[in-house]
């Protein structure tokens, strides 16, 4: 994520990843304030056996796109709501990538963080049967939680 303030949203992705049993790491990496940290991180992602990157950022939100430019791993971008433009600035920064630098862009805020974790788990489930089983259980539980009739 781009800053400490993004954690109030991105911790929701952690919760889902924990429930589904996807190993993860959480770091603060700002594309603007810590560019060397960003380059160094991107350089070791494959070596460190990372399969998917979830990058949450607010404002100009260049982190997901820059990480995508520096690695061939799937990058999922979560726009974080900003005070001035309600996250529209973040969304447009992440979704409007030039051809050849893909970022899977999710919804602004909490729903985006949760769906990014589920999407990352879906990607990992293509080669990890434990994650696949846990993800299927999570989805089944979610389906069962929906009432058939209103109270």
Where are these regions (language model features)?
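Glycine-rich phosphate/diphosphate-binding loop of Rossmann-like nucleotide-binding domains
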Residues: 1-33
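Short glycine/serine/threonine-rich phosphate/pyrophosphate-binding segments
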Residues: 6-11, 35-38, 57-66, 85-88, ...
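N-terminal beta-loop-helix "entrance" segment that forms/cooperates
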Residues: 26-47
């Amino acid at each position: 994520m781009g800053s400490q303030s993004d954690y109030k949203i991105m911790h929701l992705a952690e919760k889902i990843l924990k429930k589904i049993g996807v190993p993860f790491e959480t770091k603060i990496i700002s594309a603007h304030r810590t560019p060397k940290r960003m380059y160094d991180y991107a350089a070791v992602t494959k070596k460190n056996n990372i399969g998917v990157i979830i990058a949450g950022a607010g404002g100009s939100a260049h982190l997901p796109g820059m990480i995508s430019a520096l690695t061939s791993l799937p990058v999922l971008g979560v726009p974080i709501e900003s005070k001035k433009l309600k996250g529209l600035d973040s969304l447009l920064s992440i979704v409007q990538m030039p051809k050849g630098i893909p970022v899977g862009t999710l919804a602004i805020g909490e729903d985006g963080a949760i769906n990014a974790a589920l999407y990352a788990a879906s990607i990992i489930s293509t080669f990890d049967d434990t994650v696949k089983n846990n993800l299927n259980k999570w989805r089944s539980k979610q389906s069962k939680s929906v009432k058939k009739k209103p109270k």
